Every structure is written in C-alpha cells, then in structure tokens.
UniProtKB/Swiss-Prot annotation:
Catalytic activity entry: dTTP + H2O = dTMP + diphosphate + H(+); UTP + H2O = UMP + diphosphate + H(+)
Ranges in a coiled coil: none
Domain of life: Bacteria
The name this protein goes by in its record: dTTP/UTP pyrophosphatase
Biological role stated in the UniProt entry: Nucleoside triphosphate pyrophosphatase that hydrolyzes dTTP and UTP. May have a dual role in cell division arrest and in preventing the incorporation of modified nucleotides into cellular nucleic acids.
UniProt site positions, description: Important for substrate specificity: 11, 72, 156
Entry similarity comment: Belongs to the Maf family. YhdE subfamily.
EC number of this enzyme: 3.6.1.9
Disulfide-linked positions: none
Length: 192
C-alpha cells in the first residue's frame, strides 16, 4: 500500500517523514477558495483537507494507496486567517495577533482508495502572542518567513519568538498534528 501526501508544504513533508519512511508527494490542485467559512472552524479545515485528498485521489488512477490531506488555519475572534496575500496583509495579521490568544486548527482527511473509505478529524491548539510593536513586525516581515503560512507566522522559525504560551499540539501549529495522524493511520490498519 502506497502512502501519498496531498500537499506542497515542505513542513508537512518533513513532519510526515518522522512517521513514514517512504511516501509519495502529489500536490493538490484543489481550489481552497471554493470552501466558504461558515462559523465552524473544525468543519472548515476538514472540508479543505478532504478537498485536497479527493483531488489527489482522482489523479491516482488504478493505484492502491492511502492519501493524506491536511489543512491548517488560524482563527482570531471567530474569523479565519489564512495565508497572507502580500506583506501588507501579513503586517495586519500579526498586528491583530499581537497580545492576543488565537486558535490554530488543522483538519486531516485520510482516504483509502481500495476500501473507498475516508476518515476525517481535526486538532485545535490555542496560542497566545506577546505584545509586538510595529518595528518588530516589520523586521520579521523582512525575513520573508511569513509567506505561505496561515496567520503569517511560523512557530518553528523566527516567528516562534512572538509565542508567549501554547496549549495543545505544537506540531499542529507547524502544520501536521503527528499524534492525531498517527492514531488515525493506525486505526486504518497502516503499520507505522
């Protein structure tokens, strides 16, 4: 049985390699804008993860494989913060997160192409930022680390200096909650 990661994220690839030695990466072309946030964080990220996994399943014709889709988003005061479109949006995101608690949700969808079975779940982690002044935000943005990251920061990089507290799974904030993924794959009979 082949394991396939439906993601372009180098962070997810790196994390998955801690659980599984050999897997294939197939980038999903799923249109993330087709999923509209309707107030339920867990539902939103699971729909995105499932969309990515389904898209990759369609690309894999006649192959026995298990496809892993994942999506991570930041939520502040009931609003979703995805990946910033530009440096200005990144600045506003970090300014909003400054001194506040926010939730990071990851949705996971695992599809078994042979059994035509899908398992979905999510993980929530609460993160509290220190107060960050404009100068610090601008210096951080110059590093370019904010690109392609929900909420415009990477906890595993320099963005981690903004984090005052974390409650929940650290790997969820990085982009792939390993404990949840391990339990889901084990529950599907995948030997890890």
């Amino acid at each position: 049985m082949k394991i396939v990661l439906a993601s372009a994220s180098s962070r997810r690839r790196q994390l998955l390699s801690r659980l599984i030695e050999n897997f294939q990466v197939v980038v999903s072309d799923f249109d993330e804008d087709s999923v509209v946030f309707q107030g339920r964080c867990e539902s939103y990220v699971m729909k995105l993860a499932e969309g990515k996994a389904k898209d990759v399943c369609r690309k894999l014709t006649n192959e026995s494989s298990i496809v892993i889709g994942c999506d991570t988003a930041v939520f502040l005061r009931g609003k979703v913060m995805g990946k910033p479109r530009d440096i200005q949006e990144a600045f506003h995101m970090l300014k909003a997160l400054s001194g506040n608690e926010h939730d990071v949700y990851s949705g996971i969808a695992i599809m078994d192409k042979v059994l035509h079975k899908t398992v979905k779940s999510f993980v929530r982690t609460t993160v509290k930022f220190s107060e960050i002044d404009d100068r610090c935000i601008k210096n951080y943005l110059k590093k370019g680390e904010y690109k392609d990251k929900a909420g415009a920061y990477g906890i595993q990089g320099y963005g981690g200096v903004f984090v005052k507290e974390i409650h929940g799974c650290y790997y969820n904030v990085v982009g792939l909650p390993l404990n949840k993924l391990y339990n889901m794959l084990s529950g599907m009979g995948v030997n890890l």
